[in-house]
């Protein structure tokens, strides 16, 4: 079965609200093996809604519409679908009682126009709304295709979809499921990753491989159709192995994770503590780590030192280094890390110094970053980065590289992949 999702509401086209319903429905349909081929957004206009509905109906086995079921004049979904199906709107006493009870529970006066919500399309299956007023509907047409109407507010739509519509769709779908595994990469661009995996992406059909980019990282979503979970795991593992052979050095995690989360969990599991000295990043590194419960057992402290005076006073950066190499240098980054490690007595220390932009500073172009990492056993690492983007992009990407390099070192020290 394939489906299309249609969101109805001029407020969506105007950008006043986001269409989160589409994402939710797509995930739910994917979990039961229904392919979603298209998302459409239509304003509160009967003629345009008719055209969009006709086009979607010709392409899909199932069309799900959200929104436009309310009591006002611009709520046109129900009327438009009824006309499309050649059906009448009929009064549903149960729906009316539910609406009346809703007003009573909330101590509100029911206005006459709310009775409009008790009308449903003749012959459809009514989907109860336990969290609002407008009932949903599932219309099954003579050619076997289906039209589902759901309310627009996510607080009403989601429970109605899960509790009312989904069980009815399960009986009509093939006994296949869709399982996805998301691989997270850092330190490689989307175009380079795709180039390295181009033949795999082009030839893989089950699982499929889809690159996803965002927030300075790249993800690969592996999606497999299956009737057996063990078979799905085997297919995903085989494909992941092929990917790892080519770009495994950039892989850092799976599914719902982040660089910060993976690093925090590694630090927590190893019992190691860290401190940061931040000039360029002004506390961004420590702030992200502090967002996790239990951070106090991992994060010893942080020093934000933009001025050279504070670098000398708090982090013991030597005046000789500042005079010869400058504050934006490998030498300064290393002394900053040593200073903060001594100050807090941490197992690990990290430091950031550089040029966020927009201009040149100490002869360095915007985007130049020096990052130092001090590790247990006396290991010292210094990295030089050349990052693109505006001030905030440079600072955020510098922090991500800091977490990536730290995570790689933690993995190596534990002997894990």
UniProtKB/Swiss-Prot annotation:
Kindly give the SUPFAM superfamilies that the UniProt entry links to this protein: CinA-like, Molybdenum cofactor biosynthesis proteins
Give the InterPro entries listed for this entry.
CinA, CinA-like_C, CinA_C, CinA_KH, Competence-induced_CinA, MoaB/Mog-like_dom_sf, MoaB/Mog_dom
Cross-referenced CDD domains: cinA
Q: Which Gene3D superfamilies match?
A: 3.30.70.2860, CinA-like (3.90.950.20), MoaB/Mog-like domain (3.40.980.10)
Q: Which is an annotated Pfam family here? A: MoCF_biosynth
Q: Which PANTHER family match?
A: NICOTINAMIDE-NUCLEOTIDE AMIDOHYDROLASE PNCC, NMN AMIDOHYDROLASE-LIKE PROTEIN YFAY
Q: What's this protein's family per the entry?
A: Belongs to the CinA family.
> What is the recorded name of this protein?
Putative competence-damage inducible protein
Species of provenance:
Shouchella clausii (strain KSM-K16)
What phylogenetic lineage does the species belong to?
Bacteria, Bacillati, Bacillota, Bacilli, Bacillales
Record gene name: cinA
């Amino acid at each position: 079965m394939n489906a299309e999702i249609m969101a109805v509401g001029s407020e969506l086209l105007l950008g006043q609200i986001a269409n989160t319903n589409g994402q939710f429905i797509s995930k739910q349909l994917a979990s039961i093996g229904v392919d979603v081929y298209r998302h459409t957004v239509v304003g509160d206009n009967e003629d345009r809604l008719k055209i969009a509905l006709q086009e979607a109906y010709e392409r899909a086995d199932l069309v799900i519409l959200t929104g436009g079921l309310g009591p006002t004049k611009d709520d046109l979904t129900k009327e438009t679908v009824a006309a499309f199906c050649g059906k009448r709107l009929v009064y549903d006493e149960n729906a009316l009682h539910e609406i009346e009870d809703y007003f009573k529970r909330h101590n509100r006066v029911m206005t006459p126009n709310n009775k409009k919500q008790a009308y449903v399309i003749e012959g459809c299956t009514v989907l109860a709304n336990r969290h609002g007023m407008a009932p949903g509907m599932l219309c099954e047409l003579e050619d076997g295709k289906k039209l589902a109407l759901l309310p627009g507010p996510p607080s009403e739509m989601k429970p109605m979809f899960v509790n009312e519509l989904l069980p009815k769709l399960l009986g009509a779908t093939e006994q296949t499921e869709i399982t996805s595994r998301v691989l997270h990469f850092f330190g490689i661009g989307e175009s380079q990753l795709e180039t390295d995996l181009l033949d795999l992406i082009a030839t893989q059909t089950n699982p499929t491989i889809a690159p996803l980019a965002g927030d300075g990282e790249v993800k690969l979503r592996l999606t497999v159709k299956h009737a057996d979970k063990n078979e799905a795991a085997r297919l995903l593992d085989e494909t992941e192995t092929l990917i790892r052979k080519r770009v495994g050095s950039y892989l850092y995690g799976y599914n719902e994770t982040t660089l910060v989360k993976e690093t925090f969990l590694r630090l927590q599991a190893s019992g190691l503590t860290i401190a940061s000295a931040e000039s360029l990043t002004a506390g961004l590194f420590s702030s992200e780590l502090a967002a996790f419960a239990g951070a106090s057992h991992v994060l010893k402290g942080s020093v934000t030192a933009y001025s050279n005076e504070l670098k000398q006073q708090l982090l013991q950066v030597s005046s000789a280094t500042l005079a010869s190499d400058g504050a934006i240098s490998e030498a300064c980054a290393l002394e900053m890390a040593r200073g903060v490690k001594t100050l807090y007595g941490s197992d690990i220390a990290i430091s950031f110094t550089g040029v966020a932009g927009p201009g040149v500073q100490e002869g360095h172009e915007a985007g130049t970053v020096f990052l130092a990492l001090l590790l247990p056993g006396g290991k010292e690492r210094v990295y030089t980065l050349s990052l693109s983007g505006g001030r905030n992009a440079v600072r955020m990407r510098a922090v991500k590289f800091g977490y990536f390099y730290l995570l790689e070192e933690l993995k190596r020290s534990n002997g894990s992949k």
